[in-house]
Amino acid sequence: MSHSAIKSERIGNVLCITVDDGRANAFSTSLLVALSQELAEAEADSEIGSVVLAGNQKAFFAGFDLDVINSGDPKAITEMTTAGGAFIRQVYGASVPVVAASTGHAVAAGALLLCGCDYRVGVD
């Protein structure tokens, strides 16, 4: 599954995943599922030695999508938060090191993602 906000680039044995939704990189269900798939594919590739996860120039990640939360739709909210928890656990337990290139603010679930990564680098 691809997502328009995700750009993946392989540099040697490192997979660089950059997310830029043009705003604050809020976690939507579709973004989380696509990120999970990107990481799973990297883990399955024996030539990938590590993954770097970066945001845009404004934010690393801003947490869950407030539009979904404010919608009051319990199914959509549950799907999004479940996908978020699953992705953070996947990052934490990944078979390859995951480096967070924190390009800006990491808010709420975005901060939890930082904690799940093996290494965190603040990028100015």
Residue ranges and their predicted role:
Residues F87-D124:
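Glycine-rich beta-to-alpha active-site loop
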Residues G12, G55-Q57, F64, A111, ...:
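Short, small-residue-rich loop/turn micro-motifs
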Residues I17, L53, D65, L113-C115:
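Hydrophobic/aromatic residues within transmembrane alpha-helices
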Residues M1-A54, R89:
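Conserved CoA-thioester-binding segment of acyl-CoA-metabolizing enzymes
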Residues A26, F61, A109:
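Residues that form or flank phosphate/diphosphate-binding pockets in enzymes
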Residues E47, A54-Q90, A106:
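Glycine- (often His-adjacent) and acidic-residue-rich active-site loop
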Residues L31-L35, M80-A83, L113:
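Hydrophobic alpha-helical membrane-association signature
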